[in-house]
């Protein structure tokens, strides 16, 4: 695959910020690339989205009438025209690189160009509460399966199959892991710090959850107790059920945290209980926005109803988010540890706000 040339390192990114700014929690920045072939319908579509914590802040779609990287958060509108022009050019160049990667992957897997195929990339880093680098990561997938990933030490690669081994060998020869490590630990962190400062009113807030419990009879003998947490930010939250003080982890139905449509999140956890024993069960809620954990118990007299309108709105947005994620995020999950290792190719670092150019070509 074609390797992107290294770009000039970022010179100035609010240096004083790195020394003086502190945060109450860890933060992350991640970019997701998705490239999808569509035989007979033109060149593959390329989508790039960037997230700081749980907030999407930039997006690029090659299918737009006039493709440009665009802001997806109000605080990104502070960036001037030169920023968006530069990042748009980077996205367009990356789109061409990813399309070439897709063609090369077809050759590696001995596949024809008549079918639909997908190449996905996710990379980013986490920083601690006071700003230091915690960890970096980069994963690549082909047709929804692991292809190659940067190991935790940021010095080596794990390939998922024999085809990926080809990429791994080329990356090792090019010292690609070292390039990625330097980029993720340095320039990438500086961009994250800049965005955290510019968007601090949004990104560093802590909205506590609004909680309540609902009761849903199943039969004369059983009922479902559902513990709700609504309107919270950030997305990290813990809901646990206890019976007489003992955790009911195995018996708890827990949904993934969902966007509510207004920049906050929703979640619920449920247990099935014997009718008449509801008072023995308690729901415990932990979140950054709470001064201390909450404990909820079913109160028959309150009989709260589920806020259908708010939940439906959240589910509608969830559908949109999931749809976007299918084309813009890495959807594969790590398989069991006994999978064969493999390798995958990657690009040189970039000093742009887009993050780094990631080339899967080899």
UniProtKB/Swiss-Prot annotation:
Membrane topology: Single-pass membrane protein
KW 4Fe-4S (keyword) present: no
Sequence ranges assigned to domain Ig-like C1-type in this UniProt record: 209-297
Any one GO biological process: positive regulation of T cell mediated cytotoxicity
Sequence segments annotated as region (Disordered): 337-362
Cytoplasmic side: 333-362
Biased composition (Low complexity): 342-356
Region feature Connecting peptide, mapped onto this chain: 299-308
Family: Belongs to the MHC class I family.
Task performed by this protein: Involved in the presentation of foreign antigens to the immune system.
Stated name of the protein: Putative HLA class I histocompatibility antigen, alpha chain H
Organism: Homo sapiens
């Amino acid at each position: 695959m074609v390797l992107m040339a290294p770009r000039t390192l970022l010179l100035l990114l609010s240096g004083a910020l790195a020394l003086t700014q502190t945060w109450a929690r860890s933060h992350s920045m991640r970019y997701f690339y998705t490239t999808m072939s569509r035989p007979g319908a033109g060149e593959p579509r390329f989508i790039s989205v960037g997230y700081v914590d749980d907030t999407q802040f930039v997006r690029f779609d090659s299918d737009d009438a006039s493709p440009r990287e665009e802001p997806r958060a109000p605080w990104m509108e502070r960036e001037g025209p030169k920023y968006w022009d530069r990042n748009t050019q980077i996205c367009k160049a990356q789109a061409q690189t990813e399309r070439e990667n897709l063609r090369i992957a077809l050759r590696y897997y001995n596949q024809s160009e008549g079918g639909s195929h997908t190449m996905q990339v996710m990379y980013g880093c986490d920083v601690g509460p006071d700003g230091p680098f915690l960890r970096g990561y980069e994963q690549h997938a082909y047709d929804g399966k692991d292809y190659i990933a940067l190991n935790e030490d940021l010095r080596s690669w794990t390939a998922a199959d024999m085809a990926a081994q080809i990429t791994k060998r080329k990356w090792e020869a090019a010292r690609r892991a070292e390039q990625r490590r330097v980029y993720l630990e340095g320039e990438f962190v500086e961009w994250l710090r800049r965005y955290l400062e510019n968007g601090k009113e949004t990104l560093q807030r802590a909205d506590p959850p609004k909680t309540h419990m609902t009761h849903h009879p199943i039969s004369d003998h059983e009922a479902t107790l559902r513990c709700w947490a609504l309107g919270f930010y950030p997305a990290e939250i813990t809901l646990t059920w206890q019976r007489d003080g003992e955790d009911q982890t195995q018996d708890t139905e827990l949904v993934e945290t969902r966007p509510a449509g207004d920049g906050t999140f929703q979640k619920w956890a449920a247990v099935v209980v014997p009718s008449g024993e509801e008072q023995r069960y308690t729901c415990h809620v932990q979140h950054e926005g709470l001064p201390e954990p909450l404990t909820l118990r079913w109160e028959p007299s309150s009989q709260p109803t589920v806020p259908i309108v708010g939940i439906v709105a959240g589910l509608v947005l969830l559908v949109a988010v999931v749809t976007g994620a299918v084309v813009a995020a890495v959807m594969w999950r790590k398989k069991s540890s006994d999978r064969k290792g493999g390798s995958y190719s990657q690009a040189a670092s970039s000093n742009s706000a887009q993050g780094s150019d990631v080339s899967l070509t080899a």
